[in-house]
Amino acid sequence: MFEHLNSQPSDKIMELMAQYAEDTRTNKLDLGVGVYKNAEGATPIMKAVKKSEEILHRSQDSKSYVGLIGSIEFSKNIGGLVLNNSVDDKRLSFAQAPGGTGALHQLLLLARATKSVGNVWVSNPSWPNHQAILKHLGMNMNSYYYFDETTCEVNFDQMYKDLNDMRENDILLLHGCCHNPTGANLSLEQWVEITQLIQDKNVLPFIDL
């Protein structure tokens, strides 16, 4: 079986990580994977995480299978944290996934299965995996302008103009915070305008946090 498989191109980020590790210069900067590193270049476990793990270790009484949607208690708590308890629980549904990419993949699979969605709108630029997932699933993709390299800020006027071309039942993929790869975020006022546009156009927002 394996002799019929073709070699895939190496991951660009992993290549950069390897090059960084081999670089002997003392003044090098790692701008690759988005994880915190201390002055020694290590990624320590945060004290709050350590403490939480210790509490869980002492209190957890089972590792039995919890079902396809995962831990209901965890889901409710994380939902309250993200939404600041501003939405009625009856309007919320949860399903846990292996990371943000896995969650987006599952959502897009669900959307594709309905056979009712149109194009998926992705920012330009965006995280390359977003386009890769859509290509893998065979879904139609449109891009919308996002980042102005001259001002290093969101070009909201052009973004809004592009998104005006959305049609009913399209999907709009947004970055909830720390836009990848630009780091440029929408202001609260701009979020309000985009939310109104989503309602007016009757499109489905997917927000990658």
Briefly describe each language-model feature range:
Residues 1-68, 80, 84:
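N-terminal "arm"/small-domain region of PLP-dependent enzymes with the aminotransferase-like
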Residues 55, 61-204:
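Conserved core of the PLP fold type I
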